[in-house]
Regions:
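Conserved phosphate-binding catalytic cores of ATP/NTP-utilizing and phosphoryl-transfer enzymes
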Residues: 1-5, 116-138, 320-321
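A contiguous, well-structured pocket-lining segment that forms one wall/lid of small-molecule binding clefts
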Residues: 35, 192-275, 282-298, 325-328, ...
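Glycine-rich phosphate-binding/hydrolytic loop that grips phosphoryl groups
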Residues: 123, 305-344
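Conserved phosphate-binding/catalytic loops in two-lobed NTP-binding clefts
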Residues: 116-117, 274-275, 292-317, 331
Length: 357
């Protein structure tokens, strides 16, 4: 029996310091041996958002311990690691540089291959950590830095169907939470506040809802929230605005996902249609429920990665590393960090297409 590859993954693209070790079974299914994520919420809380320099400093302080814990938890010895995969972009350049430099040095020190991973590709392939998915599938990536519809055709083969033309959905959640007085990161709390409010209290705008194909826009919605928040006087009004915001997001995603279904079907002549949702906002239960029902109505299989691999993590980075390792797709140690690194290099450049991070 041949030795199965053991891949160390490292992720420091924003405000999570993460490391993971994965391998695969005899059927080629990935097995997560460890997946350690250290959040920096307390570091950035008083500033109401991520401060790049503080994030990078925190990565530098933690990276060695996080990688050591990932190795310890996996029960794997350093000498048995077959390759090191690190996020090289997109992201905050000062943060990317920490994990990328550490990964290169680690790989060099044990004389093993180094693999540079696109953070978005990690999200795109993350469902394969827990599901036996066949290509192609339609992916909705919704996170703090990215909001995209992608036709995932295979490793390294992606066609962008739509993206945000301004702000990412996760950013819209966090900014709305901040305006309502919710502590950073407030995005996840919006859903809980929404449960206490009336979703019909405010008629909020749905930018480019009837144009732009699969493209998304949230800046106008964010501006409307800003104006209304200045008039709010009671806690119940805050709950009502949170509920109205949540409802509006669901309506936008429902309409745009229907359009994405049509675009995906035009590009792929297949029987089994699969819709995958990944990224931190995929943890929102109301959005999940709405999209699951939409899939049932349109004969799509819906796939949501577990909550622990929806947000930024290193298991998804190691997953891409594993796929590339088997194809001997290695990188040189001078591979640069890329603050902007779209999956679909041929897609039209848009401001929101992976630029903000």
């Amino acid at each position: 029996m041949s030795k199965k590859p053991l891949i160390l993954g490292i992720e420091t693209s924003c405000d999570e310091t993460a490391a993971s070790v994965i391998t695969e079974n005899d059927q080629g299914k990935p097995i997560i041996l460890s997946n350690i994520v250290s959040s920096q919420t307390d570091v950035h809380k008083e500033f109401g958002g991520v401060v790049p320099e503080l994030a990078a400093r925190s990565h530098i302080e933690k990276i060695d311990l996080i990688v050591k814990k990932a190795l310890d938890d996996s029960g794997i010895k350093i000498k048995d690691i077959d390759a090191v995969a690190s996020t090289a972009g997109p992201g905050l350049i000062v943060c990317l540089s920490v994990g990328l430099s550490f990964g290169k040095a680690f790989a060099s020190s044990i004389n093993k291959p180094f693999i540079a991973v696109n953070h978005l590709e990690g999200h795109a392939l993350s469902p394969k950590l827990v599901s036996n998915l066949n290509y192609p599938y339609l992916l909705l990536l919704i996170s703090g830095g990215h909001s995209q519809y992608l036709n995932v055709q295979g490793l390294g083969k992606y066609k962008r169907l739509g993206t945000t033309i301004d702000d990412a959905l996760g950013e819209a959640f966090d900014k709305t939470a901040k305006l309502l007085g919710i502590e950073f990161p407030g995005g996840p709390q919006i859903e809980r506040w929404a449960e206490k409010g009336d979703p019909n209290s405010y008629d909020l705008p749905k930018p480019i809802i009837n144009k732009g194909g699969c493209n998304l826009s949230f800046a106008g919605l964010k501006t409307a929230i800003l104006k209304i928040s200045k008039t709010i006087e009671t806690e119940q009004e805050k709950f009502n605005l949170a509920a109205s915001f949540q409802k509006t997001i669901e309506e936008i995603l429902k309409k745009k996902t229907k359009i994405a279904f049509n675009e995906f079907e035009k590009q792929n002549d297949i029987q089994g249609k699969i819709f995958v949702v990944a990224g931190g906002v995929a943890a929102n239960k109301k959005i999940r429920s709405m999209l699951i029902n939409l899939c049932k109505e349109n004969n799509y299989q819906s796939v949501f990665p577990p909550i622990e691999i929806c947000g930024d993590n290193a298991a998804m980075i190691a997953m891409v590393g594993l796929e590339k390792y088997k194809l001997k797709l290695f990188n040189k140690l001078d591979h640069p960090a890329k603050p902007r690194w779209p999956l679909d290099e041929n897609a039209l450049f848009l401001k929101g297409a992976g630029v903000k991070l």
